[in-house]
Amino acid sequence: MLSNPVVISIIVLLALSLLRINVIIALVIAALTAGFIGDLGLTKTIETFTGGLGGGAEVAMNYAILGAFAIAISKSGITDLIAYKIITKMNKTPTAGNLTWFKYFIFAVLALFAISSQNLLPVHIAFIPIVVPPLLSIFNRLKIDRRAVACVLTFGLTATYILLPVGFGKIFIESILVKNINQAGATLGLQTNVAQVSLAMLLPVIGMILGLLTAIFITYRKPREYNINVEEATTKDIEAHIANIKPKQIVASLIAIVATFATQLVTSSTIIGGLIGLIIFVLCGIFKLKESNDIFQQGLRLMAMIGFVMIAASGFANVINATTGVTDLVQSLSSGVVQSKGIAALLMLVVGLLITMGIGSSFSTVPIITSIYVPLCLSFGFSPLATISIVGVAAALGDAGSPASDSTLGPTSGLNMDGKHDHIWDSVVPTFIHYNIPLLVFGWIAAMYL
């Protein structure tokens, strides 16, 4: 296993990222490492990597449109109005107790936004560049550790789709998990349904809830001050700006936001939704048509890093899939070397973690592992619920805490608006510790005792 191209390339990726090497460069080096160890050769590796870059183009374009839309919203003044209302509320009730409760209220609201983005209004991470940046000044005043915010957002983006069969959860549970497990277990007498999957995933999700509570109330509870180079606007400055905001600007912003999300839900396209929102802003006079170029340029600057990471991650995943590493990794578990039931469960979960971090998608991991995991679990005597839990957790592991995952890139896109939130150390590492470790522990417990 230690000579497997997937394992080594993931180790290289994580090591370089932790050394603060740019994530894009780390992904390129990790891809070259995987190709070299996987015997693809330099030329074939480069061709495979570049051939896979197009797979991330749509996501990068989505980020660019969202960036432009976020800039347009800020021009409308609605974000300043929200900040003003919150700041004046804070100034009226400045006691430590009230500020603490207010901090946790913000956490709860952000968690609800994130959960809704997966299940109720499945817009995924599209809400983050719109909702989070206006709150940064509030975070600074409250001295909130943004790592806690990253953990809150990532929890909502990951925990709910593996538990609740609604929205993206319906796709993951019903269309992918249940379907693939039933196909793999058809000749083995194992058939499952949505209710069983939700039951099997309940204990692992409880582990994630404990990880979230640990992050909020223990690890990142203490105040954290950020070195802000630009002097933040005072309440009087904001009041002067608020006085110039017209009611039609607020109405236009609300219409644009609703229209954007509604269009995305109907068309399943963030690009079309964002364009509709921008058109509404132009028609309502929030910015002139000739200013659209500046709006897009600012949006690109805002989201360029995130978009290029997704493009590079797509090329890296293409190289991983071109090697035999993923198949070898999964099949190594069925070689008969492992005799202990507990060790087998742990190894299956760890392999799932590596695969998901390698190909960047828990949704894509399920079809890869089920054909081996289902018969392997049954041969070790795992119950149907335990088998479901192993497959589900093995796929979900690595979604949170991966340098190239939407679940970490999304929070970074909003929290790093002012350049004070490091993607690796402030998003990746905190979410990896607080979610992947509990998922491993509680996933193993579920496998052994369900």
Curated annotation (Swiss-Prot):
Which parts pass through the membrane?
10-30, 53-73, 95-115, 120-140, 148-168, 199-219, 242-262, 267-287, 302-322, 343-363, 378-398, 428-448
**Originating organism:** Haemophilus influenzae (strain ATCC 51907 / DSM 11121 / KW20 / Rd)
- Lineage top rank: taxon: Bacteria
Protein's UniProt name:
Uncharacterized membrane protein HI_0325
From which residue to which does the signal peptide run? none
Q: Name one Pfam family in it.
A: Na_H_antiport_2
Where is the protein situated, by its record's location annotation?
Cell membrane
Keyword tags: Cell membrane, Membrane, Transmembrane, Transmembrane helix
Supply one GO CC term from the record: plasma membrane
* Primary residence: membrane
Topology relative to the lipid bilayer, per the entry, is: Multi-pass membrane protein
